[in-house]
Amino acid sequence: MQGTEIYRAELEGKMGIAPLLFTQFPYSTVAITNSATNRVTDSAAAGTALATGRKTQNSAIGVLKDQEPPISSVAVWAKNKGCRVGIATSVTVNHATPGAFYAHAAKRTLYHEIGKDLYKTGFDFYAGSDFRDATDKNNPTTDNLYEMAGKNGYTIARGYKDYLKQSKKADKMLLLQTEEASKSEFVAIPYAIDRKKGDMTLQDITRSAINFLSKDLSKGFFLMVEGGRIDWACHSNDAATTFHEIIDFDNTIKIAYEFYSQHPDETLIVVTADHETGGFVLGTGTYDLNLQVLKNQKVSENGFTRIVNEMRAKTNNQAVSYTHLRAHETLS
């Protein structure tokens, strides 16, 4: 977060920081992120802590260590009070953090079972890149998560444009990226630094969620939105991509802030992180930074790997210079 603000300031030619919107909110605090069993938490235990206020063991979602029954989340409490509820993420909708708000599983990798729990809640809006393990690995002919949507009253929209068409008549909504985008990478929507025209964004998701949930404000709504790829960029130690993701997340918060500006007395926005990833450090023993050089990076680590793999495929995995490859392509 601080690195992003310093990076923004450097791009503007200023010393210090260029503040993000959410760092200027009136209240801030800190949290201790250890799980019930590990000094270093994972997203499942951390998500459960955020959703329920209870610490559990790593890998567990919505259940406590060695205990039954499962524990419910703030999203369930809101639904039980008559509020409309939405759960949204930039990664798969049955991933650890979103799952912690609606599912109960001893292992975060039980993606199919977590996805089935999604439909048991009756929440009004879900969004993410897609499902992981949409069919049961042990019985692929039953319990298809896409087919379960219609059976449980959910309308599936594929992409923001499709949402605009489908949402007016939908009672409950499941927004996923286009099938074409999922063929390229289903586990998440593209990084901000890799984004192409037509890609679904976290802003699209958040705008859709607020639009859908605010159809009826008589009892209010609860919405959880996760910028899930910030974590992944940090896992890759990819500073430039991380900064782009945080700026993109800040732009997403601006959409929520617009709603707050229209409903200031009824709206609470909480921005938090579940844990740190990657050991991000500013400085390596010197007294200066030069973050602005990162503006020259135009693709994420994932995107770069994809480009290299495509080049290898074109050259039958033979080592050739990029200049030679381009010349060959031009001649052919």
Stretches found by the model and what they are:
Residues 1-2, 78, 176, 220-228, ...:
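Beta-strand elements within well-structured catalytic alpha/beta cores of enzymes
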Residues 3, 250-290:
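Metal-dependent active-site segment of extracytoplasmic phospho-/sulfohydrolases and closely related
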Residues 6-65, 75-76, 80-200, 280, ...:
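Surface-exposed loop and adjacent secondary-structure segments within mature catalytic domains
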Residues 57-63, 243, 247, 257-259:
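Alpha/propeptide regions of enzymes that mature by internal proteolysis
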Residues 96-102, 180-194, 217-220, 224-252:
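Active-site His/acidic residue clusters
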Residues 275-318:
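Histidine-centered active-site microenvironments of extracellular/periplasmic hydrolases
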Residues 324-327, 331:
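Single conserved hydrophobic/aromatic residue that forms the stacking wall/gate
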